[in-house]
Regions:
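Short, structured "edge-of-domain" segments at secondary-structure transitions
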Residues: 1-282
Length: 282
């Protein structure tokens, strides 16, 4: 067995927005004293940035979920090892991604133990919950269906959950909807899900859509940023738990000056955040 010949060591896995992936031993990034200069991490093309970053073991699985609703699986050691400053290898040379297919979420795991679930959110407001163990199946080289994505819709996020977590969905209209995932019954892989958030309205004449989904944990905040660079952080406690399928509560009032909502994520105090504009400014 080839795996018996591969050392079980901690790796840093990175995937950039333009689709370059690599693994690197965690030891490469040696711990420094406070005030250190850091080490050069990666040479990126202008405008590119690291979108997914995980620390995991060479023997872990990596699950790659795409906007088309497919999932691909690799062992960490199957990902090309790069140098500290290399961009890595184009993911299309590792996974058979189709034109227009993008990785939206990466979930590393050692096993597919019971009692864990995956929550899926689509741009059209659907939410789906599936037992994690359903993905412990031989995955063909060209991937398998993780969620059935309807015409005109796409997958925007996947999160690992306990089965009883609060889910927060955020729409382009600046609203956030919070509900407990127990309101969503577990479904099989080849299903579309149920309405998690109502996005039937329009924003500046274009259809509203879900931009982000995350697990709302205690002592966290929701951070949102608009297209013109305005940011706002509010306590997760400001968003009451309601039933699924609502339009949500206003998280930020959008104006022509602020622009539309560009993104949202759950953060903790003292975390550093990095913003990259469409023209590559950081």
């Amino acid at each position: 067995d080839i795996e018996d010949m591969i050392a079980d060591q901690q790796m840093v896995i990175s995937l950039t927005a333009s689709g370059y992936a690599k693994r690197l031993p965690l030891a490469t990034y040696r711990q420094q004293h406070r005030g250190g200069k850091g080490v050069s991490g990666m040479n990126l093309k202008e405008g590119d940035y690291i979108e997914h970053l995980h620390i995991c073991s060479t023997h872990d699985y990596l699950l790659f979920f795409t906007n088309r609703g497919k999932v691909y699986r690799l062992k960490v050691y199957e990902l090309p090892e790069g140098s500290r400053t290399s961009r890595g290898k184009a993911l299309v040379n590792v996974l058979p991604l189709r034109e227009g297919e993008r990785v939206m979420a990466v979930i590393p795991t050692r096993d597919f133990s019971e009692g864990r679930y995956l929550a899926f959110a689509t741009a059209g407001g659907l939410i789906k919950k599936t037992e994690f163990k359903q993905y412990n199946t031989p995955i063909r080289a060209d991937g398998i269906i993780a969620i059935k994505v309807r015409e005109g819709d796409e997958l925007v996020q996947v999160r690992l959950t306990s089965g009883s977590d609060d889910i927060l969905m955020v729409s382009r209209s600046g609203k956030a909807s919070r509900f407990n995932e127990e309101k969503v019954r577990a479904m099989g892989r080849d299903t579309s899900g149920v309405q998690g958030m109502n996005v039937s309205d329009e924003v500046d004449g274009t259809p509203n859509r879900v931009l982000a989904m995350d697990v709302a944990r205690p002592d966290t905040d929701l951070f949102v940023v608009t297209e013109n660079g305005y940011g706002k952080r509010t306590s997760i406690d400001d968003y009451p738990v309601k039933g699924r399928g609502t339009k949500g509560n206003l998280t930020v009032k959008l104006t022509a000056k602020k622009g539309g909502l560009a993104g949202a994520l759950i953060v903790r105090e003292h975390q550093d955040l990095l913003f990259i504009s469409v023209n590559g400014m950081v």
